[in-house]
């Protein structure tokens, strides 16, 4: 059995949630910020590291929100790989200090992996705005919360 463990952060501010528009292996992906657990790391440590690396801010008041409770095949592995994703809510000292774009994928060019961030309105937003199946489940939970 092969698994990949992913940890994602949910930053909600003024009715919006922060999402990441990323170019990953040539594919345009919109997802919640976060990434893979590294060996020797705890789940919260992973989230704090990922947020620091990706966004350049400290994740504060990290609280568990959801852990995948269904099977999901990884779309990014050539061999069978089950994805287990853990989602945490968090806050930052100044959400408005995070550099964001208004239009998805603005400024992403070239072949290498890249990312930009933007605020996605919860009210009136659609789950289809997110690329990953587990993120779409979490989107529905956020909207209902």
Predicted features, each with a name:
Residues 32-66:
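The catalytic Nudix box helix
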Residues 25-26, 37-38, 69-71:
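Short, catalytically relevant binding-site loops at active-site mouths
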Residues 70-102, 137:
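Active-site-adjacent beta-strand/loop module that shapes the phosphate/pyrophosphate-binding cleft
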Residues 1-3, 29, 78-84, 111-114:
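A generic structural micro-feature
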């Amino acid at each position: 059995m092969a698994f990949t463990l992913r940890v994602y952060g949910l930053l909600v501010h003024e009715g919006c949630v922060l999402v990441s528009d990323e170019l990953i292996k040539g594919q345009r992906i919109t997802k919640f910020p976060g990434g893979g657990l590294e060996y020797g790391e705890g789940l919260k440590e992973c989230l704090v590291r990922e947020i620091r690396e990706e966004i350049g801010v400290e994740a504060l008041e990290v609280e568990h929100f959801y852990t995948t409770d269904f099977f999901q095949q990884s779309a990014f592995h050539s061999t069978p790989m089950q994805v287990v994703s853990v989602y945490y809510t968090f806050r930052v000292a100044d959400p408005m200090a995070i550099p964001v774009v208004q239009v998805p994928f603005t400024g992403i060019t070239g072949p290498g992996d890249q990312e930009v961030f933007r605020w996605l309105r919860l009210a009136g937003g659609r789950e289809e705005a997110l690329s990953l199946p587990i993120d779409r489940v979490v989107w529905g939970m956020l909207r209902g919360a």
